[in-house]
Regions:
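Nucleotidyltransferase catalytic core that binds NTPs
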Residues: 1-111
């Protein structure tokens, strides 16, 4: 499942999982590779629900330069959401994940 941080989808999703241990992480995940997958699987092992915050294209350009991202937001989100270990992908629009973390209020934040 993919939601935008600004659309209220995080709150609706979390209401479906009371009493579950929520794990959160975030990143650009521009060219997803085996190391990313292992990292996400390890994060998921820490709890019940893994929520991944995903930087939008504009924030990646600010962080990494005008030639990034290589893959567009929609493709990056879809690939992440297809992973068995990922329960929710949340697109956020800032360079840093502060608002994402505040919205999710995870039991554990993995970075």
């Amino acid at each position: 499942m993919i939601v935008d941080l600004e659309g209220g989808g995080v709150e609706r999703f979390l209401k479906s999982f009371p009493n579950h241990k929520i794990i959160a992480t975030n990143g650009c995940f521009d060219i997803l590779h085996a190391g990313h997958v292992a990292y996400l699987e390890t994060a998921k092992e820490q709890g019940d629900i893994l929520i991944v915050g995903l930087n939008d294209d504009d924030s990646i350009k600010e962080l990494k330069g005008s030639d990034r991202p290589i893959n567009c937001l929609e493709d990056r989100a879809r690939v992440l959401a297809s992973l068995r270990c990922v329960d929710l992908v949340v697109i956020f629009h800032e360079k840093r994940a502060h608002e994402f973390i505040k919205a999710v209020q995870p039991d554990i934040y993995v970075k």
